[in-house]
Amino acid sequence: MSTLHKFKAYFGMVPLEDYEDDYVDDRAPRASERGGARGPRPYSERAGYGADRYGEDRYSADRFGPERFGAERFGPDRFGADRFDEDADYPEPAYKSYKSGYPVARRDDYPEDAYGEDRYEAPRRPTRIDAAPSSGRFRAGGGAPMLRGATRGALAVDPEAEERRLEERMRPEPVVARRPGIFEDGGPLSKITTLRPRDYSEARIIGERFREGNPVIMDLVELSNADAKRLVDFAAGLAFALRGSFDKVATKVFLLSPADVDVSAEERRRIAETGFYNQK
């Protein structure tokens, strides 16, 4: 049978009996070789479906007889009473005797070392050192005076000395006002004087300081406009008479410079920025 015929026979397109002799047993002689047409074979003669396959020998009594499933295999001897005997000796577990009430905790169950009183020590207070009363500064033997509660050796500490040392460290250092370079010693304005007259009667003090050769800053902020104008006229005439200079530094603030002191515009600007005229 060709492959195409097998395919058609598989899907029922052609009868299977026409090609059964070639499909089932290739070793059997074909119908053309035997000299005639061959009819279909009985079902029992086909390969694999003979009487020997489903005969009595296959399901004989020897296979499923009482010898195989007899009482000896599944009888009471196998699952008898002697296997699960009630008199078997099993060890009985030991049980503690029951006592009514709550158990009292023993003191030994909670060791005292875990939360003892000496676990956290109280803060120690510094020992006060007091000098023992004595008539002299030193003892007769030339030794140091006796101290009450003093610690001797390398660990000796004087609390009073420590307090004085701490006070000196915390004491603020005096802040020295640093003047600009033009006001330092040796500078052109090192002898400068700032005057704040309250009225026109103090014009004499301004003239005396300027006549001594000292530069004078005249602050007229607190004066009225009338008195300030009179003092400005006085200072201008004074500077002209002594061949000095008269310059305005800020509003109502003027600088009188002697003849030997030359103040530049940069220095006047620095005087106004530093506010030196506000210092007494």
Curated annotation (Swiss-Prot):
This is Cell division protein SepF. One of its GO terms (cellular component) is cytoplasm. It comes from the Bacteria. Residues 25-36, 53-83 have a biased composition (Basic and acidic residues). Its main location: cytoplasm. The keyword Cell division applies. Gene3D superfamilies: SepF-like protein. GO terms for biological process: division septum assembly; FtsZ-dependent cytokinesis.
